[in-house]
A protein has these predicted regions:
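Extended alpha-helical surfaces
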Residues: 1-63, 72-220
Length: 220
């Protein structure tokens, strides 16, 4: 097996010059904006942003619906959307549109409601860095995880899902390459849902799984 190359990344937010002051405008922008990097940013970008993210309304659409539009019903419907359950970002984008349209069709929807603050559409651009750190064995990878930079964790555990052919993270992909002894560990890591956790919680969970399975006797 080739060594596991530890990469790091930064998620850069880029304004695209679009905003919405109410739900009708939000729907209009969603129908026009087809760049998957926009949906990606508003669902995943919060994990790397140095700011508070509402744990109940984790994606930007749900948070805006609750805090600025004051539409709790819509916010709850948007908040349960988990990007890992969709085959592609485009599928997720279409589901957001469906949720918004369904809300606007309901009898209690007020089309005149204006948000306290507009929703600003942003797109993501990932800048990748090679840390030049390498894990030669699964055990070495386990030793590296506790000090792994958050950008590295995001790149290998989350962003990898849109890069790998299998749609899995880099850690489990690499461990599966080591054969049957490491398959249970790989499967456990692949089963981690990265969306409804903070990035620090994800690192702790990854560390726990590797410690459990790579301890003496579990991978032999």
């Amino acid at each position: 097996m080739d060594p596991f190359a530890i990469m790091d990344c930064a998620l850069i937010a880029i304004a695209i010059g679009e905003k919405a002051h109410n739900l009708r405008e939000l729907l209009d922008r969603l129908l026009r904006i087809e760049d998957p990097a926009v949906t990606y940013f508003h669902f995943w970008g919060g994990l790397l942003r140095p700011q508070f993210v509402d744990p109940e309304y984790q994606n930007d659409f749900a948070a805006w619906a609750y805090h600025d539009l004051h539409d709790r019903r819509l916010a709850e419907r948007l908040s349960i959307l988990n990007p890992t359950e969709f085959k592609s970002i485009d599928d997720l984008h279409r589901r957001i549109i469906d949720v918004v349209e369904e809300r606007m069709d309901e009898d209690d929807f007020d089309p005149h409601t204006e948000a306290e603050k507009p929703f600003f559409f942003m797109r993501s651009q990932i800048v990748i860095f090679d840390t030049r750190e390498r894990a030669q064995t699964p055990e070495q990878l386990g030793d590296i995880i506790p000090s792994l930079a958050l950008g590295s964790l995001f790149y290998h555990l989350i962003d990898a899902r849109r890069r790998t052919e299998s749609g899995r993270d880099d850690f489990s992909e690499w461990l599966w390459g080591w054969g049957a002894p490491y398959a249970p560990c790989a499967a456990k890591i692949a089963a981690i849902d990265p969306y409804f956790n903070s990035i620090l919680e994800l690192r702790s969970e990854l560390e726990r799984v590797l410690k459990q399975y790579l301890s003496k006797g579990n991978a032999s």
